């Protein structure tokens, strides 16, 4: 598996496999547990969960329109944040109109942004920050068992233990029913 290679060699090997695929113009089946390999090498991906096909599609179809929570969390790095929208948690965590049934909302880390007071949909305490140069990966506790990851602009002035307000880009949320099936 490519995961046994160091990062630079792994990227170079993926490029070589992609070139070979293009040159041969042949159908190739590549089996991997690494979603980055799947996203970068495949024209179409079959996502399996315990031997059951969850979804088939292009990398961008799976990323933008996951059919269920399993695919939503599997495709993308860092993975999609999933928040329950029921009862007290629904009213205390999020201020949006959600379906009348028990549901979950999924938001990808890159769709979050720091919000001004009053316009936020979420509030949480920053537990850890990874500065990756081009962006910050912020690990934010929303209370109880809810922790999310937000990929924020590196110019954001955020500190560990700070309580911050978050919003997300409109139309980038995904809703799932209590069984994990997309209800968008």
Regions found by a protein language model. Name each.
Residues 64-88:
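C-terminal boundary and immediately downstream tail of ABC-type ATPase nucleotide-binding domains
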Residues 58, 70, 84-86, 123-127:
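Residues located in well-ordered beta-strands
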Residues 36, 60, 69, 80-81, ...:
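Glycine-centered loop/turn positions within well-structured domains
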């Amino acid at each position: 598996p490519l995961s046994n290679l160091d990062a630079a060699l792994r990227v170079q090997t993926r490029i070589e496999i992609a070139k070979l695929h293009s040159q041969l113009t042949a159908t190739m089946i590549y089996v991997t547990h690494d979603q980055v390999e799947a996203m970068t090498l495949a024209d179409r991906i079959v996502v399996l969960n315990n031997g059951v096909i969850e979804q088939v599609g292009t990398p961008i179809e799976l990323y933008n329109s996951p059919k269920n929570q399993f695919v939503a969390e599997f495709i993308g790095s860092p993975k999609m944040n999933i928040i329950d929208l029921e009862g007290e948690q629904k009213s205390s965590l999020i201020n949006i109109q959600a379906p009348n049934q028990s549901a979950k909302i999924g938001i990808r880390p890159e769709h979050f942004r720091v919000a001004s007071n009053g316009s936020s949909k979420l509030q949480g305490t920053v537990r850890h920050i990874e500065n990756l140069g081009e962006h910050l990966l912020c690990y934010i506790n929303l209370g109880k068992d809810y922790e999310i990851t937000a990929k924020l602009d590196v110019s954001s002035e955020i500190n560990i233990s700070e309580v911050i307000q978050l919003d997300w880009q409109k139309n980038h949320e995904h809703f799932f029913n209590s069984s994990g099936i997309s209800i968008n």
